[in-house]
């Protein structure tokens, strides 16, 4: 469904154009049997330039070949994702995905593409919350129902808990939220404090950030950092300075939403360096592939940050696909889309590889507090088989 809508246009154009091209190069409107089985532009069109049936423009053989190549490359869908040999386990983790804002179709597509686990960071919901009760309900959802919902589609769900910087500027509310955080930091499936850090880099954000660094130390949890959209370089440097001022070990901290301006210093200072595939505002997968080629895979992580806005829950699999197409080593791909996320977010033992290598059966007959993910459909009951040799 997701892939189909994305890839339908090039395929449709190719099919329509191909039929039209045959009409311009053959007396009959029906393509010959040989044409139907042609394996190249030269075989199909005899090496001639042809007229486009849509606009009347001219296509050279090389242009036609590119159209065919692009259409073939884009013809993947969630049920037929081409295999990428990895030299290791062929599975992916999306370590930053706001799944409460996504649909069950997204879970199905992610599972089909090889995603075995997601981490959902606590963040804001698109509008400011006004009382602590809304945070309590939200924290209960990402530590409860959302874990159940993901499991109904064969994906393990984990989360991070924290007071996000965007809403931290409400002083009274922030104090109330900070007071309730400890009750959730020991919940099953909580792998870090996050996402925390700076948004507008105000004194109030700084106060809330520092308080949560101390909570992470108290509960012996890693930290997931949100870096600001504006003045990112200064904000990222300030974030690392404050963490180090509090004596927090960089090896236990993921700095997320990096770009070309921040990557070197983040890695040089010993932090885990995560990249969010948001082409317009954060990081495009072409740019990410170039950075992996430049800096390598050590402590580098890829995520989608898919949420309620325009975003892509398949950003991690698509980026893996692109890196493979660019000739990046299979083990390097495996490290940035799977191994590194497991290493840092598995530190407290809540996230373990055995959770998906030895999975519980998917049984959509089960309920969560009386609620089902189904709406009249036949329940699926089976065990998800994880493919340990390819990324799908």
Predicted regions and their residues:
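Catalytic pocket-lining loop regions of alpha/beta-barrel enzymes
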Residues: 210-294, 298-301
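Short, charged, surface-exposed secondary-structure boundary motifs
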Residues: 128-131, 282-289, 310-312
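Short helix-capping segments at alpha-helix termini
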Residues: 151-153, 245-249, 294-296, 325-331
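Mid-domain alpha/beta scaffold segments of enzyme catalytic cores
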Residues: 2, 6-7, 25-30, 39-48, ...
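Short acidic/histidine-rich active-site segments
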Residues: 295-313
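Mid-to-C-terminal alpha-helical segments outside catalytic/metal-binding sites
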Residues: 2, 6, 13, 24-26, ...
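Short, acidic/turn-prone active-site loops that include or flank metal/cofactor-
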Residues: 122-126, 277-282, 306-307
């Amino acid at each position: 469904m997701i892939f189909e809508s994305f890839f339908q246009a090039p395929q449709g154009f190719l099919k329509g154009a191909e039929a039209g091209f045959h009409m311009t190069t053959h007396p009959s409107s029906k393509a010959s049997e040989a044409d139907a089985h042609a394996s190249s532009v030269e075989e199909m069109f005899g090496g001639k330039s042809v007229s486009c049936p849509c606009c009347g423009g001219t296509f050279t053989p090389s242009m036609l070949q590119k159209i065919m190549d692009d259409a073939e490359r884009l013809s993947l869908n969630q049920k037929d994702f081409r295999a990428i040999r990895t030299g290791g386990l062929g599975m992916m983790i999306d370590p930053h995905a706001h799944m409460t804002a996504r649909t069950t179709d997204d879970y199905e597509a992610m599972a089909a593409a090889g995603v075995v686990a997601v981490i959902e960071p606590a963040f804001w919901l698109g509008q400011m919350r006004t009382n602590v009760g809304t945070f309590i309900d939200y924290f209960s959802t990402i530590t409860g129902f959302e874990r159940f919902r993901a499991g109904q589609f064969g994906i393990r769900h984990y989360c991070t808990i924290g007071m996000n910087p965007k809403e931290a500027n409400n002083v009274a509310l922030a104090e109330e939220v900070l007071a309730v955080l400890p009750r959730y930091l020991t919940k099953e499936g909580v792998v870090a404090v996050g996402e925390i850090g700076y948004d507008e880099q105000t004194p109030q954000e700084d106060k809330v950030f520092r308080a949560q660094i101390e909570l992470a130390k108290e509960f012996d949890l890693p930290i997931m950092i949100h870096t600001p959209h504006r003045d990112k370089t200064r904000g990222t440097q300030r974030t690392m300075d404050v963490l180090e001022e509090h004596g927090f070990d960089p090896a236990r901290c993921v700095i997320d939403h990096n770009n070309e301006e921040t990557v070197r210093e983040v890695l040089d200072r010993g932090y885990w360096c995560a990249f969010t595939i948001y082409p317009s505002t954060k990081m495009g997968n072409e740019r990410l592939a170039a950075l992996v080629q430049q800096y390598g895979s050590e402590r580098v992580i890829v995520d989608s940050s898919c949420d309620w806005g325009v975003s892509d829950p398949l950003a991690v699999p698509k980026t893996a696909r692109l890196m493979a197409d660019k000739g990046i080593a299979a083990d390097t791909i495996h490290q940035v889309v799977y191994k590194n996320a497991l290493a840092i977010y598995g530190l407290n033992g809540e996230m373990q590889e055995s959770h998906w290598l030895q999975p519980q059966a998917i049984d959509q007959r089960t309920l969560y507090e009386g609620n089902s993910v189904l709406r009249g459909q036949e329940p699926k009951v089976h065990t998800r088989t994880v493919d340990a040799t390819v990324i799908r």
